[in-house]
Amino acid sequence: MNVAKCRLSEGELNLINMQVAQGLVPVGVDLAARVFQVCYYDLDKKVVKNFQLTREKFFDFLRNPPFEQKMLVGFEACGACNYCAREIKALGHRYKIMPTKAIKAFLQLAKTDKIDALGIFKGTFTPSINTISARDEQNQTLLNLLGIREQLSKQLVQTGNNQRAMLYELGVVCNEKKTGVDYVIKASEELLEKLKQENSPAYSSVEVGLEALRSNVRNIEAQIKNIEQYLLDYAKNNEDCKNLMSIPGIGALSAVILHAVMGDVNSYPSSRHFAAFAGFAPRVSGSGGKVTVGEIVKTGNRHLKKVLYMCAVARLSQNKKLDHNSSTRISELLGDETTPKKKIICSIANRLARVAWTVVKNKEPFNQDKCRLLSLPTDN
């Protein structure tokens, strides 16, 4: 089958005509770094056009389209989709970001740019495909900052582990229960002092390595502290973060992560959808009218899932410290020996996700009268 001579079915042509009747011409674009593959249906010549444009010429194509109507530009979710969506919207057109898995249903040939663009084009005028909201520039940079913080934290752990391995090779076994980098540096200093007393020839090389370790750790810790200070200041000045921090168990950094990963709250139809996006929806299977609710699924946004789990653990710790009379719903669940503790934590995390969506959607702080599971114990 030749992509250049591709013919659309009558049903596909009807869907395109419906879009055009609404004042939008569907255009499918396969995004890339330097060249974009553009595909659309020419209503005058009755043919599918599928051609390649450079980055500059693509945006010229958006500014001066070959038809009078505005365009509905569809493309797959990728690294460039948010920027392109903002540019398309600024030029007066509409965009449609689609999940990559949804486009696979329209790909019937080998993998080429033209075939991908054709599949994206067909997905653009198909109304049943779910769309993804584009993130604004502030949200993107905030997510990038959180990614840098996580990367620096991993580097700090990696630096400590490398030094532990070096100490082990020199006969120093570190305590497994002491995981901080400061402990590793202290153990290295003790080894250095021992080598100095023994007049060991290895003293100079260990000294240089220890100084490099100290410098690297100080540098990483300073960068992490700088980023966290910015995030704390951001949380204090952002209304959504303030409302999120009013939820028991959610701190400033967790609120910023929730706010950043959530993005546009209107892209989730309900709080249940946001909880499922976070990965705290139970697996459901059913047949013949019998439905079984299983364990928590392993899908979902891993960053959001980790933060909500830690917030749920924090809320559980709050309950142990504050609820001396066992008056809260969490205390009732903990009192049931048949309920596993992690199951309680997952249920709290699920409720945290749903309440977080609600407070951001309604732009109001947490009201513990409306949620018994997360409410703090009252003073008697």
Feature map (PLM): residue ranges:
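Gly/Thr-rich phosphate-binding beta-strand-loop-beta motif of the actin/hexokinase/Hsp70
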Residues: 20-41, 120, 152
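Phosphate-backbone recognition surface of nucleic-acid-processing proteins
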Residues: 243-246, 252-337, 341
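Intrinsically disordered, low-complexity and often Lys/Arg-enriched segments
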Residues: 1-24, 49-51, 56, 372-380
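Short alpha-helix plus adjacent loop in nuclease-associated cores
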Residues: 96-132, 137-140, 144, 182, ...
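Extended, structured, electrostatic nucleic-acid-contact surfaces
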Residues: 17-21, 225-248, 258-261
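Glycine-rich, often acidic, oxyanion-interacting loops/wings at catalytic, nucleic-acid
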Residues: 150-241
